[in-house]
């Protein structure tokens, strides 16, 4: 029971931090159920980036230096399962649900740079402001 209270306190602190960042200025928040936390704001673009399982496992192997595919798959499954459970606990919805997103992108098709460019273009179209133009210059 004590663990659940600690978890809820951490989640509450996370909600506060994400709202503080969003209130302060334009920002990019990766994960942390930010689509749910910022769901009542009009100035948010919710994007879910995904890739086929084999590409995600290959990324785990590269990033963590794991040479055994079975071990990399176990690592990926463990993290993926925890992320799904955490998101569902907080939101009551499945992670990656298209109904809470403006955009879903398979990053394996375009690669990271073109995926980023696509998101920047979407920001520009949705908000029609200079932040997207500045991001393009920095990319």
Where are these regions (language model features)?
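Conserved nucleotide-binding/hydrolysis micro-motifs of P-loop NTPases
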Residues: 34-36, 51-56, 109-111
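ATP-dependent small-molecule kinase phosphotransfer cores
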Residues: 1-26
């Amino acid at each position: 029971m004590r663990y659940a209270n600690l978890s809820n306190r951490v989640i509450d602190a996370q909600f506060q931090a994400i709202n503080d960042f969003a209130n302060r200025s334009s920002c990019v928040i990766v994960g942390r159920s930010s689509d749910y936390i910022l769901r009542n704001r009009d100035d948010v673009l919710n994007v879910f980036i995904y890739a086929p399982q084999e590409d995600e496992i290959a990324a785990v192997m590269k990033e963590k230096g794991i040479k055994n595919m079975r071990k990399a798959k176990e690592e990926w499954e463990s993290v993926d399962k925890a992320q799904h459970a955490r998101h569902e606990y907080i939101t009551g919805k499945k992670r990656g649900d298209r109904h809470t997103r403006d955009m879903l992108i398979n990053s394996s098709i375009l690669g990271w740079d073109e995926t980023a460019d696509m998101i920047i273009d979407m920001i520009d179209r949705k908000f029609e402001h200079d932040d997207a133009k500045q991001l393009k210059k920095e990319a």
